[in-house]
């Protein structure tokens, strides 16, 4: 019986580096001519982390402490991108596995109106103002002409996520048969179910990182992934004012070894006032 070399693995097809250089020149020229604009947001520092805004075929990981409004941040980013980039054609696919759909919608209305969840839900018998409610109704009506966002609320595996992204790209193909650009947001990374053969969340996160990299290389997508933080962020030593430990570090992000090696940009969200830190960082 003939022994198979390298366990019978298929060989990969190398690409000439010269071809890569040519592609680089084409991209530089297109950027110079304004043919591949980035997605601008309302935050200059966020835009500066990329090249004038969120770029296609990138992975952005956002680590945040509980209570810092990470879901609100995600909603704001998506709303900003749609509002500030009207000349760009793209779709949005959200994996919102933490909330039920109506709760997510009410938080969206809160973002649009500036009212908090309790106000919109008439807490303690204080009925929501009629004008405020009508503003929510008007926003709902306006989305009929700008229905760019689809949402997945069901918990799924990483493989199911990839299959869903592919399905959506096929569903909304351009007239010339090409795929549209798609912004994919994930809230949050640890909520994916373990797939077959995955023993724990860390193996799942490793698979997620590999899947995100595969998808960005093969499809016109950009990912923004929310991640929870490890508990060491709450160590009392890190609550001392004017200390380097006040900052969110790469190592604070849950499953950082598995996920961050695939990220193009990493952002930390903090709210020092929660820990009564008056002077933040050295």
Predicted regions span which residues?
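Helical hairpin unit composed of two closely spaced alpha helices linked by a short loop
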Residues: 167, 180-215, 222
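Flexible beta-alpha connector loops of hexameric P-loop NTPases
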Residues: 120-125, 194-204, 238-249
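The Walker A/P-loop phosphate-binding site
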Residues: 7-115
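Conserved nucleotide-binding/hydrolysis micro-motifs of P-loop NTPases
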Residues: 98-102, 155-159, 189-191, 228-233, ...
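Cytosolic-facing regulatory segments adjacent to core modules
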Residues: 41, 48-49, 84-180
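Amphipathic alpha-helical transducer elements in NTP-driven molecular machines
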Residues: 40-43, 102, 130, 134-137, ...
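Phosphate-binding/switch region of NTP-binding enzymes
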Residues: 107, 208-282
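Structural motif
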Residues: 61, 151, 183-187, 224, ...
């Amino acid at each position: 019986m003939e022994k198979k070399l390298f366990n019978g693995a298929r060989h990969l097809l190398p690409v000439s580096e010269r071809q890569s250089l040519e592609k680089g020149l084409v991209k530089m020229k297109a950027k110079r001519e304004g043919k591949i604009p980035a997605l601008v947001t309302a935050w200059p520092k966020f835009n500066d982390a990329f090249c004038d805004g969120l770029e296609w075929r990138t992975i952005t990981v956002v680590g945040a402490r509980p209570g810092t409004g990470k879901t609100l941040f995600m909603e704001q980013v998506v709303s900003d991108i749609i509002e500030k980039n009207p000349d760009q054609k793209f779709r949005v696919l959200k994996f919102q596995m933490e909330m039920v759909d109506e709760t997510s919608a009410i938080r969206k209305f809160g973002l649009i109106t500036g009212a908090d969840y309790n106000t919109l839900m008439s807490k303690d018998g204080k009925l929501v103002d009629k004008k405020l409610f009508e503003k929510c109704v008007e926003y709902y009506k306006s989305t009929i002409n700008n229905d760019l966002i689809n949402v997945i609320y069901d918990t799924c595996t990483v493989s199911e996520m990839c299959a869903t992204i592919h399905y959506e790209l096929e569903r909304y193909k351009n007239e010339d048969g090409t795929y549209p650009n798609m912004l994919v947001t994930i809230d949050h990374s640890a909520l994916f179910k373990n797939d077959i053969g995955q023993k724990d969340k860390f193996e799942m996160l490793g698979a997620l990182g590999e899947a995100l990299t595969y998808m960005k290389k093969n499809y016109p997508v950009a990912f923004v992934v929310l991640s929870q933080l490890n508990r060491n962020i709450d160590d009392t030593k890190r609550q001392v004012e004017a200390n380097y430990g006040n900052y969110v570090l790469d190592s604070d992000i849950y499953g950082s070894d598995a996920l961050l090696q695939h990220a193009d940009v990493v952002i930390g969200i903090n709210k020092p006032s929660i820990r009564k830190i008056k002077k933040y960082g050295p």
